[in-house]
Design a protein with these regions (language model features):
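A short aromatic-anchored loop/beta-hairpin motif
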Residues: 42-175, 179-238
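Short, positively charged and aromatic/hydrophobic N-terminal segments
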Residues: 31-32, 38-39
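Low-complexity, glycine/proline/serine-enriched flexible coil segments
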Residues: 13-14
Length: 238
């Protein structure tokens, strides 16, 4: 049985997510990017790259910072916001630092005039668009993630807020797909030091340049993680 908040979010995915236009050949290439390998690098971590303390239990509103050796199309050098987490029921999140070179207007039929970018949310439900925002109760059925940050809600209300200029690129973000873990799966990845659990404020999350987010948040971890930034994104380049 899912927790109440997790069930609400899962129901929202089924009933409130926007589906993409039929995907033409160009978008098909875009979505699957050269069939890059989806696997975690099997290299044994040098002590300089290991997570020194990973005892912080993940919770709703936390972020996951991927370790530098993770070689995965979606999760390599990623920062994942945990929209909801339950030890019993699993984890739901979105990648927040991978902005795509496509706007929501290009992918969703009958969308208001809103040339906002879309972010790669994760490998699950990549035929659907989701959104988070700072508009709170202005959007009915929105689910609070943390102070000042909300997930989803009524699409028609969002359209109205966009048309009136209340909703804009500064307070709404769209995601293609999402990231999910079954019960115990994320904990297992934390034990294997695949992720570091941290936390940032809503303002920090929304104002950090996406392409610099992983490096910026690693900087905040201190000198113990200095080597993370020096490791090449492709180990074969080293």
């Amino acid at each position: 049985m899912l927790s109440d908040s997790f069930q609400f979010i899962c129901d929202a995915q089924k009933h409130k997510a926007r589906h993409l236009k039929p995907i033409d050949e160009t978008k098909q290439i875009f979505l699957h990017s050269a069939n890059q390998k989806d696997y975690l690098c099997g290299m044994k971590l040098d002590k300089r790259f290991q997570i020194h303390s990973n005892s912080l239990d993940p919770k709703q509103g936390d972020i996951l910072i991927s370790e530098p050796l993770m070689n995965d199309f979606h999760f390599g050098r990623s920062v994942v916001l945990l929209v909801d987490h339950s030890e019993a029921d699993g984890t739901f999140g979105v990648i927040v630092n991978k902005q795509l070179d496509v706007s929501v207007n290009q992918l969703v039929d009958d969308f208001p005039d809103f040339d906002a970018p879309i972010y790669l949310g994760g490998p699950v439900a990549e035929d659907q668009i989701f959104f988070m925002h700072t508009l709170g109760n202005l959007i009915p059925d929105a689910c609070k993630i943390m102070e000042g940050l909300y997930w989803g809600g009524d699409n028609k209300t969002l359209d109205t807020l966009i048309a009136t200029g209340i909703a804009n690129e500064d307070n709404v973000r769209f995601f293609l797909g999402y990231s999910g873990w079954e019960s115990g799966q994320l904990v297992g990845e934390l034990v294997r030091n695949s992720w570091l659990v941290s936390h940032v404020s809503t303002d920090r999350l929304l104002t950090t340049t996406p392409s610099k987010m992983w490096e910026t948040y690693v900087n905040n971890l201190g000198k113990d993680y200095e080597m993370w930034k020096r490791f090449p994104m492709n180990a074969e380049d080293n």
